[in-house]
Amino acid sequence: MNKDLLLSSYDYTLANELIANYPANPKEDARLLVFDRKNKEIFHTTFKNLKDFLPDCAIFFNDTKVIKARIYGNKASGGKIELFLHQPFLNSHNPLFLAQIKGRVKKDEILYFKEDLKARVVELLDDGLRKVQFFQNDKTLDTSNLYNLLDKIGHIPLPPYIKREDEKSDLKDYQSIFAKNLGAVAAPTASLHFSETMFENLRKKHKIYHLTLHVGAGTFKGVECENIQEHKMHSEFFNIPQQACEIIDSKQAILGVGTTVTRTIEYYARTKTKSGFCDLFLHPQNPPIRQNHLLTNFHLPKSTLIMLVSAFIGREQCLKLYKLAIKEKYRFYSYGDAMLIL
């Protein structure tokens, strides 16, 4: 079988010390590895110098906002519970939500949280997932009311590879400066590097466009089948404003800031769907057909994200750059350094 289709072909070894537990401070002091595909040139610089490398292009950002999706509570017996909200079921008659619950629960069990918030376990699903309904003062909560309450009592859901509790600084650090549409349970991390000043400077030279893709917990779900074509990609809600669609439909060169932007642009390029659910899986055998350039962080081995990067530059080239980044002590994952692919 073609090595590009084998899960084991996307593996690499990373020392724990290279996993960033906190972002660079200031954020634009993060390092930036630039790879120019045309000339096969590699540059090592800092993120604040990004503008010096950008060609004439429109820049697309994901303006999703991370929910405080992790809450701690108790069962009626007093046993402790941790609930991680994933997403609402949009088509259900009653407001129901998909959640992951740490701790054994039964169908119809009631869980208790701060601010008189209660959750009823409606259904036990596979992979430790649960369908739940939320109440406050015996009134069923819809998405908007629940998100407002989570803003008071919830915690920012840091990724599983950040081995610490969330802190006050994460409220700002794990949210992009242009985040406005509430609904993600993970940040579009390439966006986290941008300060207000840097963003405004970019605006002076480039047309900026926003789209929304609510990053789901599926972004952390590993690929389990050796033949990656058998992987079932998670589905995430997206919305693209008309103005942004017109740019995608044009011949204007596009830089996508982050893998979520890339998947949304490429889904639209294939389907002409402006709003809905994106489950596009990009890899070397299913490469991008529209987006020209990519700004992204360094991703987990064997993840759909490293496969997406490989779709742009080839698997072998991707692994070579990752090997170089490790040698040069770049910081990896959500709070880590960035890579620009031209």
From Swiss-Prot:
Q: Which GO terms describe its cellular component?
A: cytoplasm
Q: Which domain of life is it from?
A: Bacteria
Keywords recorded for this protein, A-Z: Cytoplasm, Queuosine biosynthesis, S-adenosyl-L-methionine, Transferase
> Which reaction equation describes what this protein catalyses?
7-aminomethyl-7-carbaguanosine(34) in tRNA + S-adenosyl-L-methionine = epoxyqueuosine(34) in tRNA + adenine + L-methionine + 2 H(+)
Q: InterPro entries in the record, alphabetically?
A: QueA (IPR003699), QueA_dom1 (IPR042118), QueA_dom2 (IPR042119), QueA_sf (IPR036100)
Under which EC number(s) is this enzyme classified? 2.4.99.17
Q: What's the family?
A: Belongs to the QueA family.
What binding partners and quaternary form does the record give? Monomer.
HAMAP family with a match to the protein in the record: QueA (MF_00113)
Its protein name is S-adenosylmethionine:tRNA ribosyltransferase-isomerase
Which source organism?
Campylobacter jejuni subsp. jejuni serotype O:23/36 (strain 81-176)
User: The organism's lineage?
Assistant: Bacteria, Pseudomonadati, Campylobacterota, Epsilonproteobacteria, Campylobacterales
Name of the encoding gene = queA
